[in-house]
Structure formats: structure tokens, C-alpha cells
Amino acid sequence: MSQFVLEIGTEELPARFLPALERELAERFTRALADAGIECDPVCVMSTPRRAVVRMDAVNPVQSESEEVVTGPPARIAFTPEGGLTKAAEGFARTQGVEVADIFRLTTDKGEYIAVRKHMGGARSIDLLRDICPAIIGALPFPKRMRWGSGDFTYARPMRWLLALFDESVVDFEVGGVRSGNITYGHRIHGAGPLTVAHAGDYERVIREQGGVTPVGEERRNAVVTGGNTLATAAGGKVIWKDSLLDEVQGLVEHPVPCLGNIDPSFLELPREVLLTSMESHQKSFGVEDAEGRLMPHFLTVLNLTPLDGDLVRKGWERVLRARLEDARFFWKTDLASSFDAWLASLDNVIFLGPLGSMGDKTRRLEQLCAWLASEVGFDDATAAARAGRLSKGDLVSGMVGEFDTLQGIMGGIYARRMGEAEAVAAAIAEQYLPAGPDSPVPSSMCGALLSIADKADTLAGCFGLGMIPTGAADPYALRRCVLGIARIILEHGLQLDVRGLFAKAFALYGERAWKLAPEDALVKLDEFFMARLRNLFIANGYETLLVEAVLAAGCDDVRSAGARLEALAAFSRRDDFASAVLTFKRAANIIRKQGGDSDVALDGAWKADLLVEDAERHLAASLEAMFPRFDGLWAEGDYPALFGLLGELRPVVDGFFEGVMVMSDDAALRTNRLNLLQALVGRLSRLADFGALQM
């Protein structure tokens, strides 16, 4: 077996590009090699800011061979009466690239045809890779591409060299004006190069030992963590690792060297969030804390070289960070000298969304919507909820959030505490943007949960009213995240809340607006949008698609109820008699769906006892009369597992009804009475789930 390596050398790529680049290279090479019939071990991909590497340690030097029988026209067309070949046969041979002497007769189920045997494969893998490599490189997707020089080729950053070796041979091709070879370049300081790689198997040794490059991202990450922990422990603390920043940092360096710096202890008067954000956002550095979780006057940064004078480099980093922290301290002191009243006045000059007014208007709507929500869910501190809604956006015009926009809400909560607001108000302001994503927690406080719901509902109503409905991947106002956030908060806090009523209230608080969609039409579209996202959320949480759709078809305005019904139905589906129950109740639902609309008499679920002539229908009627009070009581309590248990008890009776009674009797009165019996049953069933949607 042979070895292959491809290195795409570029100017520094953004760290955020590297994970997707590795995935694309692995998937595309794996697929291309399989399609070409080249057998090889799994494709290994590595990347640094200046290179993307594809390596295969065991590649078959020759393409897999096979023989294929290609069928041509029928023999009656291919041969003349005298047995010679017709022009049709000659054309077939020419098309297949074979001699006419290679044609033979092939008997099939459909008759006799002519055919040829074609030898497939057997090409040298290196020759196939000459076409595969440039095709893949040119098709790699990036969030942004650029041109350089005078050519039209585009890539994420200018391409500077290409190394492509199959064992000791160069895989010769050209991309973007760059021709492949056996030359690579190492770290700009520790092994700039050019470096010659004699054999594909030597690449990693050369780039590590001569080039001073750590090509594997996970190794760079581990080096940062191990070295950083050692330095922090020696200083009596521990590093505050942040995974997203750690991933970014390892993608910024080829030769990671952790470095512990110091900050003036006087800066520790700043809020923890401000200090960490200053370090992380501007300097790509990590904070250090003691065993009690208090910040220490240190920070950890990562260098891209081993410095000759470590103290000099450290002091340079300290000087730059000090300037950032001085700015933060200035904003902190300036903001504390202001007030929420001043900020709220300024919000009237900050546009929310075009025709939807100012951020000041939004806070006044949130004040009312939070108070309404508190009443709807039975929260006993509506005053705090309303106050949180009014103050929620004040920090947007503060100096600190102007500098560090990721601190919006967080700084509002900090300032609210410093300015004497109730703890519930301050906590709610700090939590208003939660959850920030699928892995982000929801607000922990009830006041924060209500403010977050109100904020998201207000944005959804406004955007849908203006026709700003997400399509495809485009969602500039993160409306999908808003919907999922509302659903998660309701589910995780167990709130009994009618979301349709919530959206209707949010629309009403806008008053008269120049909507592009009438509020009633926008509400319908918003309901559909919410239901689709809720469906995705339940499926992502591990529930079967059919169960989710059956529950949502029974109604999802009360999200808590939908979630509880789904959990109960999932448990019911694990019972041995589930399939039988579904078939029984689905039959009832389908009869009502099909026949109910065709009945001459409207079905209201009220049957007449004197028209119950068969024992089976009298038994069903008696069972329903006994079951309905229990059902309604359990429904009021929200005891859905017990409700599905009732259905299990009722199933044999319904089966007996179907076995012993002709529902569609020729007697119209009997037929309508029996349909009403089923309507009464289905009316209760349809509150739990749409059994007609289940497939068994």
C-alpha cells in the first residue's frame, strides 16, 4: 500500500473556518476516492491557520478492477439474416470503445441481445488524484471567499503553496496559479523553510521537527490547557477555561506557548463579567480565579512562538490589556454616575425596527406585557415583572454595553442592583436574553422567565406583522431562536400559558400600525411557525416523529400540556398493548373523520339510550358514561399518564363494539346514534392526541 499527503498552504485563515474546512475535506476526499474505486484507510485531516492537510497512510496504488457486461440492442436488430453485423451493432461497439469481434449474444428473460464485456478500472491512483485534488480544492465552501493577483480563482485566503505527494512522487496539478510540488513551509519564526519532503510518509515528521508546527488542533488545545493549568497552579489559582475561546485560540496558533501575565489589583473592583469580557474579546486571553472563585490579578494568554525574552513579551501583553481595562473602568464609573431614568429617555431616540417605533416604545410594551404575563401564570409579583420590562433595555445606551455589546442585559442587571432596584428586577434584566441558543440555560427566576418570553413575543409579533418571516436559512432577527426560547422556558418552568393568547396580546400592545400583514393573518402564520419549531424541539429531544405529530394535532397552544401529553403518550407507546389500542382508536377516529361530515345529522356526541339495540353498543355506552367523569377529573388535574391508562381499560369494550355492531346501519336513526357514540369517544380522545395520525 502507498501513502498520500496533500497540503494546501495559505495566508492565515480565520480560526472559525478550520472545523468546517476539516469536515469538508474529509467528506469530499472519502466520497471522491470511493467513487473512483481507490481503496484506502480512513482519510485523516489536520489544519492550522496556514495550512490544511489531507493524509492517507494506506492507499491502493491501483484503482480497483472489475468487469461489466453491457447489453446492446436486440439480436434481431444487430444481425442481418445472413448472420452479419448491422450498422446498429457496429455503432454499439464503437460507442462502448470495443472491437466488433468482442460482441457476443446474451440470452435474457426478455429475449436475445448483443453484449460486450468491458474491463473497468486498473488506472494508477496517482493519475486519478491529479484530477481529484484540484476539483475538491476549487469546490471547497467558505463563508467568505476572496481573489488575489490577476486571476479569477477564489479561496478563503490567498493560496501560497501546494504540496501533493504519492509516496515519493509529486501528484502534479495546478490550482489558482499555484503548481503542486514537494515543498512545504513551516512556522514563520521557528522553521520558515522552504522545506523539502522526500516521501509522503515523512510529511508530519518534517513539519513538526523542521517546521516547528503542531499540525493537529486537538494537540494544540491540549498543550494550551496543560501548560496553562501548570502556570495557574504555580500562581495559586486555576484558569477559567471557556471552550469556545479555547477552540478559537488553538485555531490562531501553529506553535502554542501559554503565558501567564499580571494585571493591576485595582482593576478587580470592576465586575467579574467586565474583566473577563475585556480579556476574552480583545486579547483572546483567559481569566484566573482562586479556589473560592474570586478573580486573581492574573490572565493567561497563548503565544504563537517560544520567545527569546519571555518577560519582555509578557510585559507587552500586560501593557495592552491594561489599556483595555482602563477603558472599561472609565465606562464603569461613567455609567454609575448616570441613571436608568436618563437611559430610558435616551431609548426614545434609538430605533427598534423601522415602523415599530423606538426602543423606548418597546420597553413600555414590555412593561405591560410582563404585567399581563404575571397575571396569566399566577406570578404574585407583577409589579417586579412590569418594572423589569420597563428597565430591560436601559443598558443598551450605557457606555459599557456600547463597548462590549455581549454584556447587554448582564450590565443592566449589575447596574440595577447598584442603583437600588429589587433583586427580582435585577435578576430578570440580567436573564432577559436567555436562552441564547440550544445549549444555553433558560432564565432561572420566574421574573426573568416572564421578561424573556415578553421580549421574544414582542419581537415575533412585530416582525410577522411586517412580513419579516424567516425563509430557508435566512433569519436575520433570530426569530426561530425566539420561538424555541419561549417553548423551552414554558416547558422547563412548567408554565400554563396560551401562546396564541400571548401573541395576540403582543400584537394588541403595538396599537395601530402600518402592518404589511393584517394582525389576524400574521397570527395564523406565527401559530404555524411556532408549531413547526415546537415539533422540531420535541423531535430533537428524542421523541418519535409520529408521536409528536399526533400530540400537536390535538392542539399546542398550551405548550406545557402538549409536552406532558407527549411524555405520557411516549410511555403508553412502550406498553405491549399499544399497537392494538392505536388500531382500535384510530378506527374510531377515521370513521368519524370520514362519515361524520357525510351524516345527514350533525354529530354532537349525544346518543339516545332507547336506540341502543345491541348488547355491545349498550356496553360501550355504559362504559363511556362511567369513564367520562373520571376522564374529565384527570384532565383537569393534568394527569395524562392516568388518562392513557383509561384508554387501555376502554379498548376491549370498543373492540367488542366494532365486532358486534354494524356502525353504518341501513337504519338512519341507528346509524346516527352509533356515530354519536363514537363521536363522544373521539371527542375525548382528540384532546390527548390525534390517533388517526399514528401509523402501526
From Swiss-Prot:
Subcellular location as annotated: Cytoplasm
Protein origin, superkingdom: Bacteria
Catalytic activity: tRNA(Gly) + glycine + ATP = glycyl-tRNA(Gly) + AMP + diphosphate
InterPro entries in alphabetical order: DALR_anticod-bd, Gly-tRNA-synth_bsu, Gly-tRNA-synth_heterodimer
Keywords for this protein: Aminoacyl-tRNA synthetase, ATP-binding, Cytoplasm, Ligase, Nucleotide-binding, Protein biosynthesis
Broad EC category: ligase
EC number(s) reported in the record: 6.1.1.14
Coiled coil: none
Any Gene Ontology biological process: arginyl-tRNA aminoacylation
GO CC terms in record: cytosol
Entry keyword Cytoplasm: yes
UniProt GO molecular function: arginine-tRNA ligase activity; ATP binding; glycine-tRNA ligase activity
Record's subunit section: Tetramer of two alpha and two beta subunits.
Family: Belongs to the class-II aminoacyl-tRNA synthetase family.
Protein name in UniProt: Glycine--tRNA ligase beta subunit
